[in-house]
Amino acid sequence: MAISIFTLSAQDVVVGAAQVDQYVPLLKGKKIGLFSNHTGMVGDRHTLDIMIENGLDVEVIYSPEHGFRGTADAGEQVSSSVDKKTGIRIESLYGSNKKKALSKEEISKIDIIVTDIQDVGLRFYTYYCTMVDLMNAAVACNKEFMVLDRPNPNGMYVDGPILDMKYKSGVGKLPIPVVHGLTLAELALMVNGEGWLDNGAKVPLQVVKCENYTHQTRYVLPIAPSPNLRTMKSIYLYPSICYFEGTSVSLGRGTDAPFEIYGHPDMKGCDFIFTPRSVEGAKNPPLLNKKCYGRDLRNLDDEEIIAKGLNLEYLIDAYKCMGVSVDAFFDNGYKYAGAKEFFEKLIGTADVRKMIADGMSADEIKATWADDVEAFKAQRKPYLLYEE
């Protein structure tokens, strides 16, 4: 999934997986479970191949949402398989096999779990949820845990409400803001330090830091982290656009610009038109084959997007242009249990839906969580590995 628009602008950044001399000696003689996917690359080589070339014993690969190759749809169940190149089994942790793969019987076969995966730093992006599941599995079996760190492309700021744990779900596992600003290694340290693992347990944890990275580094991803986050602009907009998943509005799945556009057949006063189609990575997108009217955000300046942080202006704009009841707007059409609260699971609180219905502005809504954001920034400070 390497894409031409993804170029490594922060060329001096060295990811954890590239620092072979740091982690290979620590892993020699141990049976390894590797949590990774298509983003676990160092140049043109996968971390799995680097480990094998250095004589390490990788027993099993754990794959997240979208699978080891990163091609499955969002939410699609992924079956377990075998890596064709190495013959190593791949255990999917996003499907019916998850419970068995994380059982004590299976985890007891390895000595350490190593994480190397590119995250995007948002509470509803599921890779960190899988990492926490693996941390819990490791500590339950007295196994070690290691994170080969990678930059957070949304690590420049912290924003959004803290998750109300009554909305804990597969798209939100921890009491953190939507945009937490942490790398996966920092987040793992915080999970351990704050007692967020089951029964407050702590897993034996080692991290290999990135070099030449700060939280203000504009690190451009060399590989798209998932099928519908194809550009840096979509990654920067993601903290503000993803909430459309909990509404009747399309955010562009099934087009060439997912997470960079939004619209609906009934949006009024909008000149931009698009039609979601069945494509790889979005086989059955919302509003499939329906002409949508909406907004095109592709010409927005990246730095302006970053400066505004979590920006609910797009959601409020769509709500006003639809001219429907708040309940109709937040009906995403899915017919599974809990679908009516999917927006709340994404935003993390019951309050925002009512604030939008009451006509509050994006800035007024943002002000309601400002104190919690500052408190979280102080809470996370002991776990930071990089300059803010």
Indicate where each model-derived feature is located:
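Glycine-rich oxoanion-binding loops at beta->alpha junctions
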Residues: 79-110
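Glycine/threonine-rich flexible loop motifs
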Residues: 119-131
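Short internal beta-strands
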Residues: 57-67, 148
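Glycine-rich, aromatic-lined ligand/substrate-binding cores of catalytic
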Residues: 211-293
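Conserved anion/nucleotide-ligand pocket segment
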Residues: 168-241
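Conserved functional hotspot residues or short segments at active or partner-binding sites
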Residues: 258, 263-368, 388
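Bacterial Sec-dependent N-terminal signal peptides
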Residues: 1-12
